[in-house]
Amino acid sequence: MTSAPSSTRARFSPALGTFLLLIGLNLLNYIDRYILPGAQPLIQREFHSTDEQMGALTTAMFFFYMLAAPATGWLGDRVSRKPLIVAGAILWSLATLGTAWVHGYWMFYLRQAFVGIGEATFGIYAPAVLADFYPERDRNRILSIFYVAIPVGAALGYAAGGAIGSAWGWRAPFFICAIPGLIIAAFYMRFGREPVRGSSDHLRATPNRSSFVGLFSNPAFLTGTMGLAMLTFAMGGISAWMPTFLHRNAGLSVANASLTVGAITVVDGIAGTLIGGWVAQRWLRTNHRALYLLSFWSVVLTIPCGAMVFFGPQALTIPALFAAEFFLFLNTGPLNTAIVNSVSAPVRATAISINLFCIHFFGDTFSPQIIGAISDRTNLAIGLGATLIFLVISAAILMAGSRFAPRLEETSAVQI
């Protein structure tokens, strides 16, 4: 008579509860981040800003994210990550709530700074916590599910920014997004669990995997990080400007442009992320380089589709965008898993913080503003087309990195 409740408790493990709460926070993180691109033409109109100035708003968020990453990573390897995750979620939620009272460009810029610091805290610790709950063989599956929140959150952010912003004013979607973030942060403080560091690690702790100095001589970590950085330059710039591009070049309204990008992102994001994770999981059984190789092919297939979006006939813009996003999302879980697997638990939070610093410093911190500056001097298609160069570089780095992929041991899974 008592076996059913016991079985239920077993199925709803601390790992599963923490995993679900982290997915919820990650979802809201990306909703908040992508409201700005969705509402960008509305905000630009009110502030009378140039494209370069609007790009600088996204740059501001990633710049402060990047600056906060080393300090938060250092803390995450030394103290409990649970209160730090909660603090980060509360900070970005309060900054988002405060957007309702923003009435000038520089006030919005300051808001972006606080959001960046809050997001850096969460973005570093969540993958590290999940890596301590789940062994190497299962991390690709777990992180692929976790990162599904990126396209879903981005799609909801685009849609909220464009549709709600057009109907009720661009401040409304920020206000609506802030409240759930505070609620889930409270739930995480109560129900989230802190796993023992390294409890699920089975890879040998070699010096270049388990020390801070060793990270800089760890080719698997460095190539994964720089390949992702070049990819992030393109993705960050494109995601910041794509609704505006469709509004200007495809003749869509602000609401329809944002809804179109949102719909494509959620379908491609879920399908691409889950299919990429599934293919990589099966490929890993026969080839330990699979995480890097799948990421390489994902980027290679994106390049011609992206060129068609920016420079092809208008009739092919939407189909090509659909194809490009699908291929791009294939690598979300595998590439992030490759980076997490390349380091040991004692320096994992530090490694993730270095990874985040690099992908934002060399990637999306400056790409939205650079694209805006090129657009002011030429047009937005040329600005976005420049990102294709960085996709080529990313593919080359990932192919080189596949030579250094660590061999994974067979391990038992923590079930979800």
Describe each PLM feature range.
Residues 5-11, 195-225, 249:
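Juxtamembrane intracellular "pre-TM" segments in multi-pass secondary transporters
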Residues 48, 80, 101-106, 118, ...:
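Helix-breaking motifs and short loop linkers at transmembrane-helix boundaries and internal kinks
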Residues 95-98, 106-114, 316-323:
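Paired small-residue
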